[in-house]
């Protein structure tokens, strides 16, 4: 579901909870280069948007430099970012034309959720191979 496109407002609620939302003026809107401004709620229905959501993962997309060694391939090295005094997991993901960025981001979010529930597939794999 879309919460915000380019501009995300983040508020700290209580000690450890961050909430992300969108400024009213651009709520439900995304810019799609070559097409223009789209209203996601009107195009895809109310089930495709949400007013706010807890922020527990930051995904940084960067152009892939072609060097395989410059990115964590197993998922064992965790990076964090400070947002309003809260430590939030940061995933830096290399992208290039042809990659399904939506699927990659969804996979990162699901993996993050799985880790919070106590399941770390990367660590399980490392244990299997004795790393």
Task: Kindly give the residue locations of the regions a language model identified.
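Conserved NTP phosphate-binding and transfer environment spanning the P-loop NTPase/kinase superfamily
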Residues: 52-131
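Conserved nucleotide-sensing/catalytic segment adjacent to the nucleotide-binding pocket
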Residues: 2-63
């Amino acid at each position: 579901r879309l919460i915000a496109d380019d501009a995300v407002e983040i508020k700290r609620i209580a000690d450890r909870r961050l909430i992300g939302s969108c400024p009213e003026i651009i709520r439900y809107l995304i810019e799609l280069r070559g097409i223009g401004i789209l209203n996601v709620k009107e195009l895809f229905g109310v089930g495709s948007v949400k007013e706010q959501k807890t922020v527990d993962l930051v995904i940084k997309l960067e152009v892939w430099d072609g060097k395989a060694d410059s990115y964590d391939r197993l998922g064992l090295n965790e990076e964090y970012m400070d947002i309003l005094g809260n430590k939030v997991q940061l995933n830096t993901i290399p992208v290039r034309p042809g990659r399904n960025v939506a699927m990659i981001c969804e996979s990162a979010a699901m993996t993050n959720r799985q880790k919070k529930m106590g399941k770390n597939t990367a660590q399980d794999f490392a244990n299997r191979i004795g790393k």
